Amino acid sequence: MDEKTLRSLSPLDGRYHEKTEVTREIFSELGLIKHRLKVEVEWLNYFLNNFREDLLTLEVTKQLDELSSELPDSLALRVKEIEKTTNHDVKAVELALAEQFDGNEDIQSLIHIFLTSEDINSVSYALMLKNIHASTLSWLEDIQLKLKDLAEKNKDLAMLSRTHGQPASPTTLGKEINVF
């Protein structure tokens, strides 16, 4: 056992870390920061497109598109640097995003407009759950299809059922798999 595994918070980031890679990507501190940034960017984009089209220059549109499509790890690291000063995670996200529009005070002043930290956090957590669901759903659907196939193949295979550990009326393996 290596020291990293020994100091893990749980087996999920210790001995099972290889099996939880997708989960860690989404639910890590980095994942949360990136989701917060994404929510801020999408809100700013929505707000500008619906209420301040006059500020949507080609350069601003390009910046928003780039930020929306790929948030670099370096931006998340910048958020953590700012957070040391602000002691506020969402404010740090707001300030790091404002730096991306350096020199454009009009855009900077609209970042986080009409939003609370809870708005950012609740949507970010919802997106994280949606993303983990999407990444695991195909795996679960595969299991469901295999169980359905197994139930169909064994629909006539009689077996003794049990109630509270005691023998009960006969059933079929297919039925029991379907119930499962």
Task: Give the positions of each predicted feature.
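A helix-coil-helix interface module used to build multimeric assemblies
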Residues: 2-180
